[in-house]
């Protein structure tokens, strides 16, 4: 019989400390429903949640050349991972940047963005999808977006410092278009959400936010 409590605390501790080595090597498996009578239901659910979260995070770490994540507690008191990742080797004119909240469930909250430069760095928000309705992850992502972008800017600055190939300008402007994921949020509610976090929205649902 597995000591679920100690394993849960072990996984949570290594997520909070951003222990990449642990996450890559972790091989815990979810416990199937047929064994649920052995364990308390809520503890089993929590254990399986963190096993799934680490598996998903591990996949992103393995598939990215530059990834950072931070943990937050959601409204269900579960740890979630706020992730930003990109592949510097795939840059052409623009750089694709993946920003998401990874949870120990099926669907992430996901923001597909593109970095490009004019007088300053600009981040264009192409897609913004939340995995399910009323879970608070869309608000969490937007609430932490400035922090995530500051981290991205620091990483881009490091590339400038270590290679003459790059001359990235810091991201100071956010642009994009508010396109709702119809099964989750309406256009009106999505616009209200963006407005709450400092975005200006025109009549065609185009977004603009200056970070200066």
Residue ranges of model-derived segments:
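Glycine-rich acyl-CoA binding loop
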Residues: 134-145
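Non-catalytic substrate-recognition and accessory regions of acyl/acetyltransferase enzymes
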Residues: 1-133, 147-174, 179-180, 187-212
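Residues that cap or flank secondary-structure elements
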Residues: 137, 182-183
